[in-house]
Amino acid sequence: MDINDFAKYPLYKSIIELNEEMERRNIPPIELNVVGGFALMIHKMRNRNDNSTDIDFVGPSLSQEIKNITNEISIRNNLVKDWLNNDLMLTGSTLEDIEFSTGRLTFNPAFELSRIKINVATLESMIKLKVIAIDTALTAVDNSGDFSRYKDFADIINLMKKTGLGYDDIGKMLDGYIINPNTLSVIKEYEKSGREGVEIKILLLQREALDNKIKIMSGEALESKTYVRSSFTEDLLNNLITKSKEKNYDSR
């Protein structure tokens, strides 16, 4: 794949400009394992001029010198400041950190410039990343947070169609990594009813999580009242027991 074929699109154009500036300043080469919307563009599963505004990659953070260059490019090409970033929703940023949450990820070479090598996540790895992102977001919802991953649903459905993978396949692929028991059912709900169906299901899950918290809190309060006595209550009970024993002794 030749990146110059896509040079008219802002993100591709910006990568070329970054490479040229790194070459001019003699900055050592970097290798980027790309995920997210940019990876889907490379896989031709999104229009190259869609609403993707950044390039997500897995790996060490960029040097400050490279960040300064990307900031300059963002102004020139009207991009967001952090258009090239490793700020993923999952814990950590290195490949090892991410794989701790997703299992093994695979990247294939996409294109290489003089100072920048781009590897792209395979379609199966993209499914893993997006399903775990939804799983993480649903866990936050259970903790009274807001759900923020609606854009991933359509991508997952399209990736499943492209790869031929079903829900059982994904369940096996991510066995031991999916935390929330509702993750796959929520994705199924999107495929069936769209965003509206997911919003309703999430509201029901939030209500269920709240009910469970109330039950737990009520149980803790009951347990506290049942087993943890105040010093006053303890003294009162001891006095009553003592008096009862004295009464029984006197009645003999």
Locate the predicted segments by residue:
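Compositionally biased terminal segments of proteins
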Residues: M1-R252
